[in-house]
Amino acid sequence: MLHKVEMDLGGRKLSMETGLLAKQSSGAVLVRYGDTVVFSAVSYNRYAKSSEADYFPMTVDYREQTYAGGKIPGGFFKREGRPREKEILGSRMIDRPLRPLFPESFRKNLQINSYLLSSDLENEGEILGIMSASAGLAISEMPFSGPVGAVRIGHIDGKFIVNPTITQLETSAMNFVVCGKKDQIIMLEGEAREISNELFLQAMEIAQVEIRKVVELQEELVKQAGLPKFVVTEQLYPEGMEAAVKEKALPDVLKLNVMSPKLVRSMAIQEMQSRIATELHGKYPDCERKVGEIMDDLMSADTRARIFRDRIRSDGRKPEDIRPIATEVGLLPRTHGSALFTRGETQALVVATLGTKSDEQIVDGIEREDKKSFMLHYNFPGFSVGEVKGSRGPSRREIGHGALAERSIEQVLPKDANFPYTIRVVSDILESNGSSSMATVCGASMALMDAGVPIKSPVAGVAMGLVKEGDKYEILTDILGAEDHFGDMDLKLAGTRVGITGAQMDLKVAGLEHKLMAEAIERATQARIKILDIMEGVLAKPRDSISQYAPRIVMFMIPKEKIGAVIGPGGKNIRKILEATGTEIDIEDDGSVHVSGTVPDMVEKAVAWVKSMVEEAEVGKIYDGEVTRIMNFGAFVEILPGKEGLVHISELSDERVGRVEDVVKIGDRIKVKCTEIDDMGRVNLSKRMADNPNAERRAEPRREARPRSGGDRRNGRPPYRR
């Protein structure tokens, strides 16, 4: 039976329906907004035992079918392949608000498949993916404490826009995806153009109002088609095991919790875990993993209690303190820009590389094919946390962290017209104990300034945490990895001294009240200013020039109608320039030209060459030209590529000239002055006036018409008159 609900959201109709598609799944919902349609199906191992993993084994796969935009996939096989970066980020966006809404003891394998089935090329699918996945879980029998709503918030011309279109986002001052329950925000992610804290919080308030409507719509669908929820009865641990582990571990856990550095602490925890598991092996075989979970709970309880009781964290800091910071730039001699940013036991080596137009990344999406001239790649090798990890390409986490840092930095980059370089920033995390993505933001800002990229202002980032018990709470600044793990919130906030450029928040509790968020944002701002002070103490502004090893790029415009003349038949002209100068030349349809190369003199030569090909003759200007043809009445001289003018025999010399060949020959290079461009565009030149700047144009008797066979490129020229 088909069940359907609908409402107005942001001036467009939002509809949800179930009962027609994928009826054998645990829950399936189709969401339509405009002409964009997303379908999500959720399923779980209903009859299998809970997973033995120490985490909730939920996977989300968001895919944008190319047929949704009326396209056929490229490549040899002509079918969808590995998920694109946008799809991976969409999968993470769906996963993050849903994961904390399941009970800890529910560990059955759960899968969410979301598909973009139709795209109107204006409304993006990720938001609908969150809605449809949430609705699918809400109508299923699974113990999901949702539903959740999701909206995108923009700000254009002083007004907030709910679910701005792709076109509107191009001029929007912010782009935030916000998810939550009726009265609490659970997840947010996005970017902004240095907005104030007040504007950010207003956006969250508006988002909350719209989220409530979306949640109520899903609740209406649940009333029509929802199944009764089952109660999770499985225990996490065998009877008596938790008490036995606590008895053996509790005396030492308090000591371990304040042990540093991280590696020493981790080794001590592992040794204790193995020892206790060995002691309990007779009664509880293969129990080491569960022993680790119980010890984890003990350390979490101790960490939180100490913060509430003493306002002291495991590393001795107060809740509002940031860790010691050290940063340096220019440490890699042949790179274009480099920085090492160290905050506590988190360390990022960040390198900026400048490239040319040909280095831009082509992004083939459902909406359109686009090009990216700024890329930030984040790498998290195993050794950064003392582990062994295979190299299989970037993980979803690495892609997500890189995207957050990229969005945060992108807001301060110069426009292409002012700095026509392709920029790639790579952040290699060398050590990690919390907030490596924000260390990447700080390091990227420093590396870009070291590379001479004229960014508007430095950007810094900090991760905020939270511990909350009932009405009691404590906000933590610059959290450690353990505080992220044991705490209730991970709020990453990046920005300049002016305002916020990037934000991401994930909660492990049911939601976050507006008052708490406002306080966390203010604390993050204070920390960000302190970090910027430290960064600017090392390098306060971009270097005056780019690295000597970076390519030189000159950008200028030529008339669109001259593009063909520059390229030449079959690319003949442009190839000649490339071969002679060793440069790269990119010409866009709008007439913009990018000339790049590693040898400045060759770049200048190529620029002058191209400009000369489109230059028009100018009366009064002296040119260095080549004699191309000789007639009985004068000589034709090429003063610009493809542009000839006539030096009449009377203008070859102050003396009387009997034969043109007595003064010039074909192939001679001579200086000539442009004296006239007639109504037909023909150029008249004078060698005599170029040789003698004081010479005046003299009157000559009228001359006879030239023979038609000796004319110009049109095989003839009307009579020359003085």
Spell out what each predicted region is.
Residues 25-111, 116-123, 182, 189, ...:
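Glycine-rich, flexible beta-strand/loop modules in the N-terminal catalytic cores of phosphate-handling
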Residues 27-29, 123-141, 329-352, 433-453, ...:
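Conserved phosphate/anionic-ligand binding catalytic regions in large, soluble enzymes, centered on
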Residues 33, 42-44, 62-64, 114-118, ...:
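Flexible glycine-/small-residue-rich
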Residues 114, 186-191, 232-236, 247-257, ...:
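Short, hydrophobic beta-strand segments
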Residues 141-260, 448-544:
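Mobile "lid/hinge" segments at catalytic clefts and subdomain interfaces of large enzymes
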